[in-house]
A protein has these predicted regions:
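Intrinsic-disorder-associated, low-complexity terminal segments enriched in Asp/Asn/His/Tyr and depleted
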Residues: 1-2
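A short glycine-centered flexible hinge/capping loop motif at secondary-structure junctions
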Residues: 200-204
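Active-site entrance/lid segments in N-terminal catalytic domains of soluble metabolic enzymes
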Residues: 5-198
Length: 204
């Protein structure tokens, strides 16, 4: 079976249970259940980004979380493949919105979570707050730092993450504050950690 061979040959595929080492961008407002299921059904990892499936914003953390729950359930109706939900960490504390969605992710037994972070040292408290409960519930964790560094990658690995995503300045959306290209940031980090590493930014 070629699909099983591909999984065994690629550590990202093996860890996340996907067929192709492709992780869909967790774009705010753009993703929905149909989008995510299509990516997962094609062998990649589809991700429900912030405000997935929504056309308007709510200031109520509980309603935000319940909207994500409904989108998770819709996704499950469209695919039996692994998919992920995004959790956002910023500043030096977790927001009530993030923690409410964390609860939903655990309750719904989502197979994978993508944590969008802003890099160590300010993220250490957030890593501890998010990664431990996810690990305790056997949810795979992909951490994408917008300020990737060897130090951050090591901390992420120590806190139990399964995959680290390094983002270069080539990317679209929220740009890293340092102007280091994607293919320059990768060799800085890949030999410093043992968990699989993915690269984001300017790759097509």
């Amino acid at each position: 079976n070629n699909r099983e061979v591909n999984k065994k040959m690629n550590r990202v595929c093996e860890v996340l249970g996907i067929e192709k080492p492709i992780i869909q961008g967790a774009m705010s407002w753009i993703t929905n259940a149909e989008f995510v299921a299509a990516v997962s059904n094609a062998g990649g990892l589809g991700i429900l980004g912030p405000n997935a499936g929504q056309k308007d914003i709510t200031s109520d953390p509980d309603e935000t979380a319940e909207r994500m729950r409904r989108e998770i359930q819709k996704t499950r109706e469209l695919t039996d493949k692994p998919f992920a939900v995004t959790l956002i960490g910023s500043g030096n504390s977790t927001s009530v919105f993030t923690m409410k969605i964390l609860d939903v992710v655990i309750e719904e037994k989502v197979p994978v979570v993508l944590i969008n972070s802003y890099g160590f040292p300010g993220m250490l408290g957030i890593y501890k707050a998010l990664l431990k409960p996810l690990k305790d519930n056997n949810i795979k964790m992909v951490v994408r730092s917008i300020l990737p560094s060897v130090e951050d990658a090591k901390v992420v690995e120590e806190q139990g993450a399964d995959v680290y995503v390094a983002t270069g300045f080539d990317e679209g959306g929220t740009l890293p504050p340092r102007m280091i290209g994607s293919f320059n940031i990768l060799p800085m980090i890949k030999d410093a950690i043992n968990i699989p590493i993915c690269l984001a930014g300017g790759i097509a």
